[in-house]
Structures are given as C-alpha cells and as structure tokens.
C-alpha cells in the first residue's frame, strides 16, 4: 500500500507496482498539514484512475473528530461512497460507525493501538482489516494472526480479519503516533493531522538546578530513524501480515516510486520466483532505498528491540538529492524522446535524473544522450532547448531534476 500526497505521487505509485494507495482529502486526516492532500472533487477521478489500473483506494479519515466537524465528516464519507472508494482508514468510533452505515469498508488505523486479539475481535464488528500497533514484535504479531485463524475472527464482509503493518517510513517517538508535544509547544495537534515535527530538532539537556548542560551522545533524542524491513520482509510475511503499508504521504514522488518498486521486487522474490531474499538482492534494494528521503534506518520493534534508535542529523540522510534544472516542452513517442528547456544548471550524458508531473508520476533514469536540434552534444546549459531519450511519456510542464549524489 503506497502513500499518496499529490498527483505526482499517485501516478508514481500506479506505475511502480502498488496494489493499493492511501490518501486524505480536505482535513480530518493525519497528514492534513504536511501533504498537499486532495479535495472532495478529486475523489471520483482518483477512484476511477485507480480502478482502471486495478489498484485499490483507501481514504484516511483517521484524526480525532469534534462535533463541529460532523457536517464535513459526513460530506467526506458521502463523497467516498459515491466515488466507489475501496475502504476508509479510521480510528474515531464516529468515523468507523458512520462509514459502515454508508456501506463503506473500514480499516482500523494504527492510531487505535491494537496490541492483542481481544481488540481485534472488538473492531471486527466494523473492520475487515486492522493495522496493528507499531510497537509489537513479530512474535506478538504471529500470535495475533494465529488467534484470528484459530478463533475464526471475521469482519463484516465475511472474510477473516486481515493484519496490516507498516513496513517502511517515518516513525514517531510516541506510542502509535499519539503525541502531544506539538500541541503543547505550538498549539498544533499531531492527533488532528497538524504535527509541526518539533521532535525532529536537536535539543540540549540542561540541569535546571545547576545550569550544567548534560553531555549526551546524540542531540536528536526524540527523532527516531526510519523503519526499514526489506532485509527481513520474509519474516514479516511469515508472521501473518497480509498488507504492507509504506509511510510517506508528505514525501516526494521519487520516494514513492523508489520504495514501492523496491518492496514490490522483494515480495516477488519471496512469493513468486522462489529465489527468496538473497543477500545480493537485499544489498541492491538497500542502495536504492538509501537514495531517497530517510533519517537513517532501523528495524523498528519487530525483531524484539525495546528502545528506539535515533537520527544523527536534522532532515534527510538520503544519498541523493533533487536539483531542479529543466521543464518539459513536448514528447516524441515514436522516438522515445522528450524535449526540455534548461532553466537552471546543466546536464551531461551519464547524469541520473528524475522527471515528475501530475500525470507522469516520477521517472528515474540515466541520461544516455543529449541533442541540440539533431546534433549530439556533451552538455546542455541554461537557455538550451534539448532532447533526451526518456523511458515513458513526458508531458508539457513536467519538471526535470538532476538527481545528484550528496
């Protein structure tokens, strides 16, 4: 399941192997502040686009909801039902019951902090899929999965309840994301989708009685590294997890494309070709995942670790960064070539690039050749109109970035 916070990310997910996408509209979702989100008017088009691609659509309505938002809440659910959205991801019982009253399938958000079989049984009154708490280890996940099978716990649609877990992306230092730090310091509630991420800053610990500053190994003491499970994804699957969820609705389309493609390849190696997760494949996928936004990686709590691992810097530890240089003008499908205008910087054969657009998604490729008019050249510079081979269609206005090593 891929995170979608923009049109670019949506099409990046669709072209990279995602089986489902999740996203928010208007407010009432946990990334209302940090991602672009969509409007109610977008729902029908998103649902139709994904349906045509054979991809399911999951709408997040997973914040705390107040009485004053009942009308908006109802409008969102009505629009979701009318558009044919596959399911609602929710945590507030008001959203859960209202969605079921409209005939919408419900998935229980990780905000509900489900850690045991009885909680799964309780939510199975409304939900066909539950996201377990991120603080569980794989033995605990396996015990819950076994209990669902053994006790035949079924959701409203008649099938056994499915377990969904996060497999990659940002983690919060609070239990299942229930954090009040942003509200306390900035009057902006994380539980309302408005986290200001002040936990990601560097902090100095001071003894208030003496004024002494304490020497700590890492100043980013509230900023966890990102979760990565690709090197033990076979164990996650064996634990009974049926839906893998990637975090990252606030991240760019190149992140979505890269992470979805990596986990798709890993799953196919585990399930389809019998080769499994070889050390060579894991190393290759690790290299790819390191290129896009991350705060460093750790295993989360899945392998039994009790304490978190913290970031060592502010912002991303990615090995690549995007630098905008050009805008697409047209595409020549028979030639497999895109034409661009260089607006900043320069480009040379062998450079790695990312091309993004609301319909294009994210294309990651290496420049094989550059032409000015019909003549091959060794570089394109500011003001040049140039053409390069592209792996798929590009559209006027698409943005071309140099994806350069950090």
Segments and roles (model prediction):
Residues 1-4, 87-91:
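Short, hydrophobic beta-strand segments that form beta-sheet elements in well-ordered domains
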Residues 9, 94-95:
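Alpha-helix capping/helix-boundary segments
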Residues 96-101:
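Short active-site loop/helix that positions an aromatic residue
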Residues 115-120:
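Short, glycine/polar-rich helix-capping loops at beta-to-alpha or helix-loop-helix junctions
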Residues 35-44, 49:
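A phosphate-binding glycine/aspartate-rich beta-alpha loop in the early core of alpha/beta enzymes
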Residues 1-16, 20-32, 46-47, 53-61, ...:
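Surface-exposed amphipathic alpha-helical tracts and adjacent flexible/coil segments at the periphery
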